[in-house]
């Protein structure tokens, strides 16, 4: 049985003071032991968050990593080796904001995926379609292509030590969300695509939903058979709301 996961992506939010306040709020939460819970602060705050949460079961991740695993001459980047040294356990790769706004392509994302795994970290591979692609009926095609890029490069077994997050771009930060049935349809298609390569891998990989998940809709979303938890954006900046989402995943 797949263990649920809830991961909070704090994006480019926070000051030292607000992060300290959020850490304090998270430490007060009653969190389910049956759920893997993670937060991903801006890299500037990684050590502050690792230290602040060390008495809890919450693990710390990163929002991005460099294309090379080791530290070196790559201005402005953070290597997976440095993230591991700071206490990170998992790293986002291919988030839609980096695909859409930074222009990261599959070849770059594949290098990041490999670098993350090379240092023993878990990549959280993000896939998802834009509103235009959804309206054109291309959702499964787009998501399948993004997934195929990694499988073609590394083989499906590389996903054994990875997590996949489906995040419809049109539902990120908009207040819109896919219905539980719409989200389940895509998650089921992802698992079916993996099953064509290896049924055991397909059954073991955790698939998270990301797209305006809140405490109010988390229970219904997480009740779907192929949704194993959530990648949480704005709601993860509120400790009480994030705690409620985590408890929903534990039910």
UniProtKB/Swiss-Prot annotation:
GO terms for biological process: gluconeogenesis; glyceraldehyde-3-phosphate biosynthetic process; glycerol catabolic process; glycolytic process. One of its GO terms (cellular component) is cytosol. Gene3D superfamilies: Aldolase class I (3.20.20.70). The active site is at 95 (electrophile), 167 (proton acceptor). Its EC number is 5.3.1.1. Pathway: Carbohydrate biosynthesis; gluconeogenesis; Carbohydrate degradation; glycolysis; D-glyceraldehyde 3-phosphate from glycerone phosphate: step 1/1. Involved in the gluconeogenesis. Catalyzes stereospecifically the conversion of dihydroxyacetone phosphate (DHAP) to D-glyceraldehyde-3-phosphate (G3P). Homodimer. HAMAP family: TIM_B. This is Triosephosphate isomerase. It comes from Pseudomonas syringae pv. syringae (strain B728a). The lineage of its organism: Bacteria, Pseudomonadati, Pseudomonadota, Gammaproteobacteria, Pseudomonadales.
């Amino acid at each position: 049985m797949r263990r649920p996961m809830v991961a909070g992506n704090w994006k480019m939010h926070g000051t030292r003071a607000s992060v300290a306040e959020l850490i304090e709020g998270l430490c007060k939460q009653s969190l389910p032991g049956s759920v893997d819970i993670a937060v991903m602060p801006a890299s500037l705050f990684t050590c502050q968050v690792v230290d602040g949460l060390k008495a809890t079961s919450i693990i710390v991740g990163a929002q991005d990593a460099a294309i090379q695993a080791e530290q070196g001459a790559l201005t402005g980047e953070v290597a997976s080796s440095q993230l591991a040294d700071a206490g990170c356990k998992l790293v986002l790769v291919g988030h839609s904001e980096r695909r859409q706004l930074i222009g990261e392509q599959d070849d770059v994302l594949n290098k990041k995926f490999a670098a993350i795994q090379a240092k023993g970290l878990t990549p959280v591979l993000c896939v998802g379609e834009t509103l235009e692609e959804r309206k054109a009926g291309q959702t499964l095609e787009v998501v399948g292509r993004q997934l195929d890029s990694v499988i073609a490069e590394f083989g499906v077994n590389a996903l054994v030590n990875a997590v996949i997050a489906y995040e419809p771009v049109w539902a990120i930060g908009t207040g819109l969300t896919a219905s539980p049935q719409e989200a389940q349809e895509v998650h089921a298609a992802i698992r079916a695509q993996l099953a064509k390569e290896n049924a055991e891998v397909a059954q073991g990989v955790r698939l998270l939903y990301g797209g305006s998940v809140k405490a109010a809709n988390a229970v219904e979303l997480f009740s779907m058979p192929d949704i194993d938890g959530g990648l949480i954006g704005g709601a993860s900046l509120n400790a009480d709301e994030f705690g409620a989402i985590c408890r929903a995943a534990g039910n």
